[in-house]
């Protein structure tokens, strides 16, 4: 799809499962060298092994994205393994579902560290390498929850994802000095391993509420991230792409009908 991705060195945080796994696989198919980062060692190694078994290049690094030393180690290992860093996909995130009245303040802090602080750390750790390269790409995985809509039990998640977009705007201005673009993909309802626990009836109802009548696939998010990383998107920074199958359109139509 995008020949400029071939031989690029890419980090995907939260790359062992879900959306991150999809992003890693999409980049690997385009010939990128992918460093998969996650806390889960077994899952991370399995994902890297799967990519290699399909002809791709991938390694795994265990990483706590909320810890500065761990993120620096991730970047250093990427350089050791692949000779540099070209693309940072800050995808890692957590989304426990707890209503505000029941939420422990520590849970709020944990979600902010995993979802928001991690984006800052990944960008900060990448800048020296991007400066050395003469440029680079950062892609954040945000969400429609928070910036566009809300969902009961996800006040902390929504706040963290909204915070990512605030960070994105200022980061795009600061990173331009290094010829680095930073953009965000905002997924809607994407089918991942975790959703299977909800049951088929619930998933069918969820899909029926989406104009395209299906849940998104992790590769849909990977393809959007791939676009932002490509040479063809080199004049785009500080922007977002909503990948939701038109999920938020009915809400807009309902608002218009009420006028």
Give residue spans per PLM region:
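Short C-terminal tail/terminal secondary-structure segment
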Residues: 4, 237-259
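Conserved glycine-rich cofactor-binding loop
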Residues: 16-18, 40
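The beta1-alpha1 cofactor-binding region of Rossmann-like NAD(H)/NADP(H)-dependent oxidoreductases
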Residues: 63-73, 105, 219-220
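Substrate-binding pocket helix/loop in short-chain dehydrogenase/reductase
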Residues: 99-100, 107-112, 195, 206
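Active-site helix of classical SDR
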Residues: 123, 160, 168
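Alpha-helical segment proximal to the catalytic Tyr-Lys
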Residues: 128, 173-174, 234
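Short, small/polar-rich loop/turn modules that mediate ligand/substrate recognition or access, typified
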Residues: 176, 181, 236-238
């Amino acid at each position: 799809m995008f020949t400029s991705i071939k031989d690029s060195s890419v980090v995907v945080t939260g790359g062992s499962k879900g959306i991150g796994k999809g992003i890693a696989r999409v980049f690997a198919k385009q010939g990128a060298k992918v460093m998969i980062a996650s806390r889960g060692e077994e899952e991370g190694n399995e994902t890297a092994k799967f990519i290699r078994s399909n002809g791709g290049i991938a390694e795994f690094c265990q990483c706590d994205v909320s810890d500065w030393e761990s993120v620096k180690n991730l970047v250093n290992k990427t350089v050791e393994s692949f000779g540099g860093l070209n693309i940072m996909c800050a995808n890692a995130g957590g989304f426990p579902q707890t209503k505000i009245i029941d939420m422990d303040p520590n849970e709020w802090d944990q979600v902010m560290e995993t979802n928001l602080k991690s984006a800052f750390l990944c960008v900060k750790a990448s800048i020296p390498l991007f400066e050395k390269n003469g440029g680079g790409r950062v892609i954040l995985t945000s969400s429609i929850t928070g910036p566009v809509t809300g969902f009961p039990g996800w006040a902390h998640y929504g706040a963290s994802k909204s915070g990512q977009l605030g960070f994105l705007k200022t980061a795009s201005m600061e990173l331009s000095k290094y010829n680095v673009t930073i953009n965000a993909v905002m997924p809607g309802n994407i089918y991942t391993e975790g959703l299977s626990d909800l049951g088929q009836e619930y998933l069918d109802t969820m899909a029926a509420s989406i104009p395209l009548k299906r849940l998104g696939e992790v590769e849909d998010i990977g393809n959007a991230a791939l676009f932002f990383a490509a040479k063809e998107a080199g004049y785009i920074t500080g922007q977002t792409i909503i990948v939701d199958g038109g999920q938020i359109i009915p809400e807009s139509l309902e608002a218009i009908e009420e006028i």
